[in-house]
Amino acid sequence: MAKSTQSIEPNIADLVNSWLKSYQLDYKLEQEPLNDEIDKALKDYFTKNGGAGANRPDAKLLLQDKNLDYYPILIEYKGYPDKLVKKDSEDNVENRTAKNEPHFKNINTFAVNGAVHYANALLHHTSFTDIIAIGVIGEKDNKGNIIPKIGVYYVAKANLGAGQEVAQFTDLSFLKKENFDAFVQQVKSLSLSPEEFERIKQQREQEIDASLTKLNNDIYENEKGLGENDRVLQAQGSVFTNKYAEGY
């Protein structure tokens, strides 16, 4: 019988948290509050399992660049060497199924997918439009040293929350105060081709349509006591909420 690989997530957490501490950054761990707006968004957004509760990134921080713009940083750790990111056939972070439903298995299993999920919570429920989602995994070499692997993704209103890989990094020193402005410039240089943008936009519109279909069915089943006009008004309110959240 093959020997199962043991998760080293606690070691990954120790390593990365030690980096953040050495950079003298004010980072917060899972259940620690960061910012009222961010904390509420993580609480209100659907969880990685699809239910109610709270979304808890392994680490989170809020950094400011030279233009006084704030960037939430959301970090997720996984303890297996093959659990950094799961992408679809278009090379996008695969957080939706073929039926345009949340891909909870990927969101739960892969570090970047989880971090991008958290970032979308902020896009939907806060005033922040530019978020950095970071996934970190790793493995031990034959001497017991941790060899980390890092995925850094830009999740923004400009890319409709899809997430774009920024670059390859071996640590998180780009978050240090003296390096952060250069990192922001690098992030801002990213763009989607018109074809990529249109494809993602169509996917987002399909997600909204699927959500509204489900909403309509739920209203019909759960609010049969309402008059037709009441049901229409309730549905319209949800349409506007969804459209606003998606930035259309």
Where are these regions (language model features)?
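Alpha-helix initiation/capping motif
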Residues: 7-8, 176, 227
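Residue-identity detector for glutamine
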Residues: 6, 24, 31, 64, ...
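A short, conserved, highly charged catalytic patch centered on acidic carboxylates
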Residues: 1-132, 137-151, 159-160
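Non-catalytic nucleic-acid substrate-recognition regions in nucleic-acid-modifying enzymes
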Residues: 179-248
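Long, acidic, intrinsically disordered low-complexity segments
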Residues: 44-65, 162-200
